[in-house]
From Swiss-Prot:
Positions that bind Ca(2+) 1: 186, 188, 190, 192, 197
Textual note on the cofactor: Binds 4 Ca(2+) ions.
Listed cofactors: Ca(2+)
Cellular component per GO, a single term: cytosol
Coiled-coil annotated spans: none
Lineage: Eukaryota, Metazoa, Chordata, Craniata, Vertebrata
Organism annotation: Oryctolagus cuniculus (Rabbit)
Name used for this protein in its record: Calpain-1 catalytic subunit
UniProt note on regulation of activity: Activated by micromolar concentrations of calcium and inhibited by calpastatin.
Main localization (coarse): cytoplasm
Domain III, as annotated region: 1-114
Functional summary from the UniProt entry: Calcium-regulated non-lysosomal thiol-protease which catalyzes limited proteolysis of substrates involved in cytoskeletal remodeling and signal transduction. Proteolytically cleaves CTBP1. Cleaves and activates caspase-7 (CASP7).
Catalytic activity, EC: 3.4.22.52
Keywords in alphabetical order: Autocatalytic cleavage, Calcium, Cell membrane, Cytoplasm, Hydrolase, Membrane, Metal-binding, Protease, Repeat, Thiol protease
Length: 302
């Protein structure tokens, strides 16, 4: 009698008939099975990094990578915890799939996902007196006589800046996206950005530009879903799969790429909301309670 546990893995591509109407053929797919290290067994939110896969060989894999709708293989492995990694043969290909698992004996399965968290450095908030004189001069030039940046002025400033960076794909910052940024950064509630508020936003955008360029791996001037995930993690955020899907749905263009203006709006909102939540979570239990007025004030204003 064979020793070990017998099971069948099947990986199926979804929506291929719909994709074929747009000229997209079947992707070349397959999967690999890795044993979970003893010290990580039982962890509910296991996340294996790139170094793990470089240092550990797979215990089993599909017989081949092939451009069929479904790939399936029967395996027999010793009892233990394993991670199944489905993939396309070529890296960074987008696609929906179903992974099915059939076993002779009862076995538990779960989808691995990240816990939501943000590792953000303390934001340096300078007083007006501490801000660099060159920046003050720039601010006075941009803000005009009232020394406040309005929504329209912010739109003009950002679009003037991005137009000088020919490597960035953008349709320009819309009035709505600029209004959202002003509302998120406006601490005194007057609907405009003063010197200190604009200084914070300016520093954030400079940081986001560096992250965008670093993770625009194909130099397309935009972010694919794969690049977007790495960029968001580099900015200090850990999100789960559902939130990543919502971000791509909310901020991507019809080709599922995220332009620079949408990338900035996304990260400004993420960082502001995480910092806002942290301020309200005084007992650090990860739960904040709002009354209806506070909830409407927060959601409608942002």
């Amino acid at each position: 009698r064979e020793s070990g546990c017998s099971f069948v893995l099947a990986l199926m591509q979804k929506h291929r008939r719909r994709e074929r109407r747009f000229g997209r053929d079947m992707e070349t797919i397959g999967f690999a099975v890795y044993e979970v290290p003893r010290e990580l067994v039982g962890q509910p939110a296991l996340h294996l990094k790139r170094d793990f896969f470089l240092a550990n060989a797979s215990r089993a894999r599909s017989e081949q990578f092939i451009n069929l709708r479904e790939v399936s293989t029967r395996f027999r492995l010793p009892p233990g915890e394993y991670v199944v990694v489905p993939s396309t043969f070529e890296p960074n290909k987008e696609g929906d799939f179903v992974l099915r698992f059939f076993s002779e004996k009862r076995a538990g399965t779960q989808e691995l996902d990240d816990q939501i968290q943000a590792n953000l450095p303390d934001e340096q908030v300078l007083s007006a007196e501490e801000i660099d004189e060159n920046f003050k001069a720039l601010f006075r030039q941009l803000a005009g006589e009232d020394l406040e940046i309005s929504v329209r002025e912010l739109q003009t400033i950002l679009n003037r800046i991005t137009s000088k960076h020919k490597d960035l794909r953008t349709k320009g910052f819309s009035m709505e996206s600029c209004r959202s940024m002003v509302n998120l950064m406006d601490r005194d509630g007057n609907g405009k950005l003063g010197l200190v508020e604009f200084n914070i936003l300016w520093n954030r955008i400079r940081n986001y530009l560096a992250i965008f360029r670093k993770f625009d791996l194909d130099k397309s001037g935009s972010m694919s879903a794969y690049e977007m995930r790495m960029a968001i993690e580099s900015a200090g955020f850990k999100l789960n799969k559902k939130l990543y899907e919502l971000i791509i749905t909310r901020y991507s263009e019809p080709d599922l790429a995220v332009d620079f203006d949408n990338f900035v709006c996304c990260l400004v909102r993420l960082e502001t909301m995480f910092r806002f939540f942290k301020t309200l979570d005084t007992d650090l239990d990860g739960v904040v309670t709002f009354d209806l007025f506070k909830w409407l004030q927060l959601t409608m204003f942002a």
